[in-house]
């Protein structure tokens, strides 16, 4: 299964936010083992922020306090080019899905951070919006009727 997500840096709160492609809200911030991406305090997030979002199509782990499970997020743009040809990242992700030996979670996190922060901070891109693919997750899909709160759904 794969869910297409937008990834956007919120400079006001210094967090990385995710949302389903096509949704109007900025989604929830990534937290947990991604390192320098802090989770906002409850008072920093309006109670109704993202309440209109439909969560269909996203795996349960997308709403875990530790963030999505092992595969994390992979830049769709990078997967479509030869940038990752030496590691053939889509094949690596597929191997992880099957439980075979592949890149460690730490390596995948480093790859993700490089995709995002190198482009945004070093190259100075003005449009801080990328499309990412969350793939290979074995968790069941979230099936909750909209409206629901994107930040508090489990």
UniProtKB/Swiss-Prot annotation:
Residues 68-117 are annotated as: Mitochondrial targeting sequence. InterPro entries: Transactivation_prot_X. It is found in: Host cytoplasm; Host nucleus; Host mitochondrion. GO terms for biological process: DNA-templated transcription; symbiont-mediated activation of host NF-kappaB cascade; symbiont-mediated arrest of host cell cycle during G2/M transition; viral genome replication. It comes from the Viruses. A fraction may be phosphorylated in insect cells and HepG2 cells, a human hepatoblastoma cell line. Phosphorylated in vitro by host protein kinase C or mitogen-activated protein kinase. N-acetylated in insect cells. HAMAP family: HBV_X (MF_04074). Belongs to the orthohepadnavirus protein X family. May form homodimer. May interact with host CEBPA, CFLAR, CREB1, DDB1, E4F1, HBXIP, HSPD1/HSP60, NFKBIA, POLR2E and SMAD4. Interacts with host SMC5-SMC6 complex and induces its degradation. Interacts with host TRPC4AP; leading to prevent ubiquitination of TRPC4AP. Interacts with host PLSCR1; this interaction promotes ubiquitination and degradation of HBx and impairs HBx-mediated cell proliferation. This is Protein X. It comes from Hepatitis B virus genotype C (isolate Vietnam/3270/2000).
């Amino acid at each position: 299964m794969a869910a297409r997500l937008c990834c956007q840096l919120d400079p006001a709160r210094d967090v990385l936010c995710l949302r389903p492609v096509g949704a109007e809200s900025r989604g929830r911030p990534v937290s947990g083992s991604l390192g320098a991406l802090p989770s906002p305090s409850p008072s920093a997030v309006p109670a109704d922020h993202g309440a209109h979002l439909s969560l269909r199509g996203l795996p349960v782990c997308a709403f875990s306090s530790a963030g999505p499970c092992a595969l994390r997020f992979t830049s769709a743009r990078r997967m479509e080019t030869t940038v990752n040809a030496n590691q053939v990242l889509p094949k690596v992700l597929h191997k992880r899905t099957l439980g075979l030996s592949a890149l460690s979670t730490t390596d995948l996190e480093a790859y993700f951070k490089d995709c995002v922060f190198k482009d945004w901070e070093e190259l100075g891109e003005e449009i801080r919006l990328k499309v990412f693919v969350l793939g290979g997750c074995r968790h069941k899909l979230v099936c909750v009727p909209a409206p629901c709160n994107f930040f508090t759904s489990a």
